[in-house]
Amino acid sequence: MKETIVHMGFDDIDTPFGGCTTHFVASILVKWVKDRRIKLIDYPNLIRLNPGVPWKTRGNGAVVLRFKVKNYDEAIKLLEEAYDEALEYLGKYHHPQHHPVIGMYIGGLSERIKWIGWKAVHDLIPLDLMHRVLEKEKNKIIYKLLRKDKKRGLIGVFSAIGYRMTNTDYTYELIAYRSEEYIDKPRQVNAESVKYMDKVFHNDTILNYDYETNRPLITPHGGDPVLLGIRGEYPDVLIKAYNMVKINEPVPIRLIYRTNQHTDAHLRRINNLGEAFIYRGVRVRVWVASIPKRIMGGHVIFKVTDGRRFIDVAAYEPTGKLRRIAEKLRPGDEVEVMGIVRPQSSKHGPTINLEKLHIIMVKPLIKLENPRCPRCGARMKSAGRGKGYKCPKCGYRDPNAKKIVRVIKRDLEPGWYEPSPRAFKHLMKPLKRFGKEKNHYPEEIEPSNFIWYNNMLLK
């Protein structure tokens, strides 16, 4: 009997008060791997969607499990089981902006659902657009709303399902989860061991430690169930890196995800500022049009132009070294700016929130100076229009003297610039990943060594 491929997506199974979508999926996957011998065709996928949309979930990520079942009835049974488990998981939380959804797409993905996945990573997806897409896919989808009439999670679920990562860049993340009795307590992760791990595996892991503030970056804050997350290029490296970190609390579950994190997938190259629509992630080649100014809060603002249109660019205080570089820009410098377009407000127009800066050309600064007196060396003054210069000290005159052109050396070089480590968001690609991009992944490959329960590898 031919098996059927199923893509099951999960979104918004968390709240600001607790819970975590990846934790829920990890918990149910432990049961399915142990008891049902579920046959995955990919690592669990953690898909980060456009971080600029106004109604994003925390982290704006959704999770997808891609697996094979014997028949349609088995797929429905798994969906019902996931739904019941999610209701129980969310029973202790309530939040009015909460739109939890579990959805399923059966069979090979259509070009339409792949398109919506591609678009959702860098652009705005209105709910009515998603409804129109799902109506055309109605014979291949089924979903469950965990809150009556709360449908926005459909966007995350089916966009993540459509973002397959078979011909786009990807990375991996190993996430370790906490025991329930430890949640809300300080995380027992040894900072020095994280620093040592970073030095050993720096080339193939991503943003483990911030040496400017001297603190680990792999441990989140707050009361969610995540103990730590180590991100990197390859699963085997993450396993070795994790084993080097000293942890002084139980870790009931850990799981490796394949993900679009740190790939700049949310940035789309645009031709001009006319395409810089609000909430869109963009990268665009422009010229600096104003001297950067520092405003209240330590943020730096400057204008850029494509020759016809203008837009503000903001380097916020947490970006650290990127903000300091932005302050050195001057009108006429040619740059490529990357970031999310923020909507206008009563105080400012649309603004690109700067994530990365590529300085293409630094315009020389020219200063015109009065010539010096050849007799005494004093700086001469104008003798009047068309009359040359005279020396105020010794009286020497030169009717043919002209201003001296002096080129001032800029304290700025062409190149790529990124923010301080603490300012990185999920999708932002560090410069050290340049040249490490991947562009292929098999349609079907059963992962191994990706899920542990009570420190035991499940197979």
UniProtKB/Swiss-Prot annotation:
Record has Transferase as a keyword: no
Cell membrane listed as a keyword: no
Reactions the enzyme catalyzes: cytidine(34) in tRNA(Ile2) + agmatine + ATP + H2O = 2-agmatinylcytidine(34) in tRNA(Ile2) + AMP + 2 phosphate + 2 H(+)
DNA-binding feature ranges: 282-360
EC number: 6.3.4.22
Biological process annotations from GO: tRNA wobble cytosine modification
Function: ATP-dependent agmatine transferase that catalyzes the formation of 2-agmatinylcytidine (agm2C) at the wobble position (C34) of tRNA(Ile2), converting the codon specificity from AUG to AUA.
Name of the molecule in the record: tRNA(Ile2) 2-agmatinylcytidine synthetase TiaS
Organism from which the protein derives: Staphylothermus marinus (strain ATCC 43588 / DSM 3639 / JCM 9404 / F1)
